[in-house]
Amino acid sequence: VVTPLNIAYWERNLTCDIDSLIGSAVRGKDLVVIRLGENVQDKQAFRPGILRLVEYCKQKAGRVVITGCFWEDAEKERAIIHAARTHGISFIPIDWIDRLYDSRPKVGDTLYDVEGKPYTVTKEFIIAHPDDRGMRKIAEAIFDTLR
């Protein structure tokens, strides 16, 4: 059973109680994929925060993997790589997708939500995010690591 979680709240509140945020969703899972970082604003607190998050997930799930950020950010990437190495989990770089592919939507493009329903991009903020092709590339990078 896949349980997608949006933990953008954690990215902006790096010292929040992880258990109350994700505990029931990750407990006993075979796999946790940590895919975050772009919304982090406090880069200094991110390094110890991501270490705590990875450690927590490792205690609750059978396997944990983590991706880098879609948007290139060397400081965040170093913190994520450090957490992966410290806790012995796989690190999956994905910033190359943004550099190598035209994978950002434009206003007026049609994308699909998690239920497969189409919607038209109308807001400027969404154009910095990966489009459906970019999301597919991210998913493929994760899946390739899991094989």
Where would I find each of the regions flagged by the language model?
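Conserved SGNH/GDSL esterase-like catalytic core that processes O-acyl groups on lipids
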Residues: 1-47
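Residue-level recognition of beta-strand->loop/alpha-helix junctions
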Residues: 2-6, 68, 93-95
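A generic secondary-structure signal
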Residues: 20-24, 52-56, 141, 145
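Residue-level preference for short coil/turn positions at secondary-structure junctions
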Residues: 27-28, 60, 85, 131
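Short amphipathic alpha-helical segments, especially helix-boundary/capping motifs
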Residues: 30, 54-58, 114-118
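Active-site segments of SGNH/GDSL-like serine hydrolases
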Residues: 33-42, 51-83, 87
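Aromatic/hydrophobic pocket-lining residues that form the small-molecule binding cavity
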Residues: 46, 50, 135
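Catalytic His-Asp segment of secreted/periplasmic serine-dependent ester chemistry enzymes
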Residues: 71-147
